[in-house]
């Protein structure tokens, strides 16, 4: 055997085998598609970063603390059809991976919807149903409560990032507190309002409470009001005379305004809620205020 290896043929063969071995090692180490196809390593790509929806960047250019969104936009329940909502959710949520706890992505999740009788705040009422998609929940609530479905879409993203939540950033809590309604930041939601359908219905009905009984709330349209910059009282407040009911409702729902630092990346006193509502709405649907 040793004499064969020392012969010219043996040397050439040994060199060839060594070269082949090195090539195979390199192909496998680099995850080459050629290696995967030729050698059955088709799962090599599984070790890469899972795909995820494209991130949404809020466009807050033109933000006006006194006029975040026009009434005509906020209460336009016909802004999108059921089919348009479904197509929108499928598009922005494309690439989503289920959460590590098994939570389904927004585009594929389904929910049981509780019956809601017609009320002063949501005159349309809602019928009980099961296996309802997120898009259909949004449509049903928008029609029952006379609110723009775009507002609900922006709200669930501003509160929980649900339009693009994926993998490690997606959990059951995101649906439980989808709209931030009756849910303290660091505590459990009121069980009566926990869950995606109840969150949307509760938030939509609350915005009409603000509209129908404005004097019972802190921020009233056309009345000068000091609005805090942060939950930290040391960050101060600024006077705002909001232009319309929709903007007043947003401040009653999220009682902080962005400070000047928000336009430059923010600081320890920046509250992003209403800034992001405006910014995400503009990114996704165009300006929420007329020129």
Stretch-by-stretch model annotation:
Residues 73-160:
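Export/targeting segments at the very N-terminus of extracytoplasmic proteins
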Residues 78, 127-135, 144-149, 171-174, ...:
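Solvent-exposed, acidic/flexible segments
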Residues 59-60, 133, 167:
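Residue-level detector of functional hotspots within protein domains
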Residues 103, 173, 221-222:
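Residue-level signal for alpha-helical context at structural boundaries
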Residues 2-19, 23-92, 182-291:
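Non-catalytic cell-wall polysaccharide-engagement segments
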Residues 122-125, 162-194:
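Substrate-binding clefts and substrate-entry loops adjacent to catalytic sites
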Residues 150-153, 164-169, 216:
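Short, solvent-exposed secondary-structure capping/transition elements
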Residues 157-164, 208-212:
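Hydrophobic/aromatic-lined pockets within catalytic cores
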């Amino acid at each position: 055997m040793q004499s064969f290896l020392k012969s010219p043929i043996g040397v050439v063969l040994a060199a060839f085998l060594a070269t082949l071995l090195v090539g195979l090692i390199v192909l496998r180490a680099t995850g080459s598609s050629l290696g995967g196809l030729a050698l059955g390593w088709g799962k090599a790509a599984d070790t890469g970063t899972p795909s995820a929806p494209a991130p949404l960047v809020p466009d807050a250019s033109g933000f006006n603390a006194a006029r975040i969104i026009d009434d005509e936009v906020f209460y336009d329940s016909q802004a999108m059809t059921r089919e348009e909502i479904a197509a929108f959710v499928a598009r922005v949520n494309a690439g989503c991976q289920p959460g590590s706890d098994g939570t389904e992505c927004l585009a594929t999740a389904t929910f049981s919807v509780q019956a809601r009788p017609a009320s002063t705040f949501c005159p349309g009422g809602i019928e009980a149903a099961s296996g309802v998609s997120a898009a259909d929940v949004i449509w049903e609530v928008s029609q029952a409560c006379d609110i723009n479905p775009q507002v609900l879409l922006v709200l669930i993203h501003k509160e929980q990032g649900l339009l693009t939540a994926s993998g490690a950033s997606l959990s059951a809590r995101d649906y439980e507190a989808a709209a931030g309604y009756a849910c303290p930041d660091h505590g459990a939601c009121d069980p009566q309002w926990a869950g995606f359908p109840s969150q949307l219905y509760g938030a939509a009905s609350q915005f009409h409470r603000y509209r129908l009984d404005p004097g019972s709330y802190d921020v009233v349209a056309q009345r000068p009001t000091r609005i805090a910059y942060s939950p930290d009282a040391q960050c101060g407040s600024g006077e705002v005379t909001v232009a319309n009911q929709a903007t007043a409702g947003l401040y009653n729902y999220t009682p902080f305004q962005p400070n000047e630092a928000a336009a430059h990346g923010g600081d320890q006193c920046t509250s992003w809620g209403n800034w992001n509502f405006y910014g995400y709405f503009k990114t996704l649907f165009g300006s929420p205020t007329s020129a």
